[in-house]
UniProtKB/Swiss-Prot annotation:
The lineage of its organism: Bacteria, Bacillati, Bacillota, Bacilli, Bacillales. Residues 4-200 form the DPCK domain. Its EC number is 2.7.1.24. One of its GO terms (biological process) is coenzyme A biosynthetic process. One of its GO terms (cellular component) is cytoplasm. It comes from Listeria innocua serovar 6a (strain ATCC BAA-680 / CLIP 11262). Belongs to the CoaE family. The gene is coaE. This is Dephospho-CoA kinase.
Length: 200
């Protein structure tokens, strides 16, 4: 059995940047966001269960999930957010475990799991080590407002729906500081790969 490394962060700390750098280094990575889309595609039982709970208004005209509308609903309503997680998380977990098995069977020794809500979903047991991509809360807020064209209040609502980034950093085996330049972030990623991936 190979090693599984969890990659997480918060809503605008730059986890996607780090994820891309890992994949560019040729290391297999299973993305929970991609898995989450797969398990609620048109025709899946995951989507059917979401429609049963949230209603048909949650669908676009072509019968696919209206992600923007669902996002608005769950960011404002904790109970509905928890219900969505209850529907999707077990399916996402199964998808990711199957992908990991495929990589290990192909001879890979290390697989990354990119999981935005790793701690919130209590998935620490799936991985051997955890990397957290960190920025200051101020940088996180600024980036989210700019990236998603949100007001400060809207951005804070999204950030506050997750565990705080400083709390996540305390739980990590390795923290990547993504508060400054891409070059500095790249160096940290390469250092991690050298220490924990190549030095198996």
């Amino acid at each position: 059995m190979g090693k599984t490394i969890g990659l997480t962060g918060s809503v605008a700390t730059g986890k996607s940047t780090v994820s891309n750098l890992i994949q560019q280094a040729g290391i297999p990575l299973v993305d929970a966001d991609i898995a989450a889309r797969k398990v609620v595609e048109k025709g899946t039982d995951g989507l059917a269960e979401i429609v049963a709970y949230f209603g048909k208004d949650i669908l676009l005209e072509d019968g696919t999930l209206n992600r923007a509308k669902l996002g608005e609903i769950i960011f404002q309503d904790k109970e509905k957010r928890e219900k969505l997680n209850e529907i999707t998380h077990p399916r996402v977990k199964d998808y990711m475990l199957n992908e990991r098995e495929r990589f290990f069977e192909a001879g890979e020794k290390v697989v990354f799991f990119d999981i935005p809500l790793l701690f919130e979903s209590h998935l620490e047991s799936l991985v051997d080590q955890i990397i957290v991509v960190w920025t200051t809360p101020e940088t996180e807020l600024k980036r989210l407002m700019e990236r998603n064209n949100l007001t400060k209040e809207e951005a804070l609502a999204r950030i506050n729906s997750q565990m705080g980034i400083d709390e996540k950093a305390k739980k990590a085996d390795f923290v990547i500081d993504n508060n400054e330049s891409l070059e500095k972030t790249q160096k940290q990623v390469l250092t991690f790969i050298e220490r924990f991936v190549n030095n198996k």
